[in-house]
Amino acid sequence: MRRRIVITGMGVVTPLGTTIQEMFQNLIAGKSGIGAITRFNAKTFPTTFAAEIKNFDLAKYVKDASPWKDCGVNSCFAAAAAQQALEDAGLLDNAKVDRTRFGVYLGSGEGIQDFNNMVSMVARAYDSQTRSLDCVKFAGEGLKHFHGGREAEQELHTTPAHLAQYFCLEGPNFNCLTACAASSQAIGEALEMIRHGDADMMLTGGSHSMIHPFGVSGFNLLTALSTFKGDPTKSSKPFDLNRDGFVLGEGSGMLVIEELEHAKKRGAKIHAELTGYCSTADAFRVTDSHPEGRGAIACIAGAIKDSGVSIEDIGYINAHGTSTQVNDRVETLGIKKVFGDRAYKTPVSSIKSMMGHLIAAAGAVELITCVEAMRTGILPPTTNYETPDPECDLDYIPNKAREHKA
């Protein structure tokens, strides 16, 4: 018999709140966390707004923030969300569990990015006569101005490694950075690890911020970001005819998942059961979905098949809903291909309309939102939905939360 996996702990750090209750209340109220970028001077960029987390201080969330002082923002967001999730699961204060069977699987963004130091090093190593970078001098500058710990913090594995060390989690430890799918994939792979008996418990989810000059300029070059000229809170408009790109957000979502009998034995509170997972690739283009939605269709259908539930049992779809022309059209097509006529009877919404796109952390935060929607019977809306798109013709819960049993 296949092992059943449940969620026993959850935590978030988002632009709409740094607790689950605060975040969800803001979502169902239709509030926006999007505003002018304050992290750096973005006035010369095509996009000047994002969904930032304001006044974040890790010391407010963990007992001892000193081990994190040299860590990047991705690790610090993850630590705060993980602290909440582990506390929610009753696993702090020397809880008696087998730590060798308790792992970490994240979809977390790149390690620390020391842009100011890097730019100054490039400037000092630039040879004006040859108009080129002196690589030997650049390496020498690195030896002067970097230390070993700072170098290690740039690696992709640092966030799960830090969480394992800080919370003494000695089981399997992985990070996958598969762009927007990262934390969803991490949760699915953590689920599979428990199913296969490699662990009994996993701390899983994601953490990411790309609200920095290279992140904004990079997505601007891809023409992926909204360049809306009005009120920034109106800029992200998933499934609307006039959508023009996504808005960067940042944050972390963390969950504790464990085998059902293990959770029952220790008297854990159970939030929900994870029943289905599937992972596919479009095999089309790195930056675009397949125009016929092949990967999306296969993934949705595969997850439903793996779960053993019927389409009629599904009461809500939390969409990726990025507010780009291609994604929203292809995602709608994928839902209709899998759900058939049922697609028009199943509410769909995108919380990216309010908190932007958390990139690697998006899936984890949106899963937690789904759990809260099921618990409360209230579905968050898709805000800024004004002009219907003939190709996006489902029920997107426009502009106002809805009471609905999901």
Give, region by region, the residue ranges found by the protein language model:
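Glycine-/small-residue-rich "gating" segment that lines the acyl/pantetheine channel
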Residues: 127-147, 188, 192, 208-265, ...
